[in-house]
Amino acid sequence: KLYATASSDLYDKWDKYMQSHKKKLDFAYNTLQEAKKSGDKDAINAAQEEYERTFKNVTLNDERYKAMINETTAKMAHVNEIALGYVNDETPKVYTLNYNAFADEKIDGYDFTLVNERAVKNLIESDKIELPPKKVDITKDQRWNAKNLNSQLMQGILQGESIPKIAKRLQTVTDMNRNSAIRNARTMVTGAENKGRQDSFKKAESDGVIMKRRWVATHDERTRAWHSDLDGVEVGLDEPWENEYGEIMYPGDPTADPANVYNCRCSIRAIVKGFA
């Protein structure tokens, strides 16, 4: 809903702004269309140049347009902050659930000590658990979105597109922004899940439990081929899995290559061998 609202706001702002220049832009656009119909190359080139000049003058070269883009990207960055805040609030819960999941192993002669979410939050805040909350780099976020908005605008101008068609182009940027947020959220949750499991395995190992870790891939068309290849592969607690993109300690490992991490939905499970 957050991103749908942001997309709608962008469209409304664009429409309101462009309506104030509609007469001259429509004239330039219609002139270009007539030139194309005529088939006269010189007329087409002249009309295209005039269309580009007119459009750029009311957008990329206009201070009011620049202010609109700045306001829009600031709001998009704020939406990203809100969305990331939701995820940051959830990751301690995700970590806790997956840490405590080791108790389900029901190993004879071994009682696993559960942790609570408040304790996990305290450990995260004191850097005793490597699960730091993510933050939005506002400047970088705004710059990225402004670049993409202006890039879509330029492509539309160079293609000689109408105002409504360019408006649809701009909406793809908010879709990209939403997809990026979903990817980051999925990656953070996967990392929290498997970091919780990894830490629970380490605790059990320190108590004398001998085990290995098994990679569990998600079996569908969205799973990376190199993660499917890792499915069922067992390694020691301090051993990484390896593939063509390097080493990875667990699904969602923030120290691994991004190609091994982003959008990953894999997990790990303990394979208990006995006691030391």
PLM feature segments, named:
Residues 1-175, 271-276:
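N-terminal leader/targeting and assembly helices and adjacent pre-domain segments
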Residues 175-176, 180-276:
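Acidic, glycine-rich two-metal-ion catalytic cores of nucleic acid-processing enzymes
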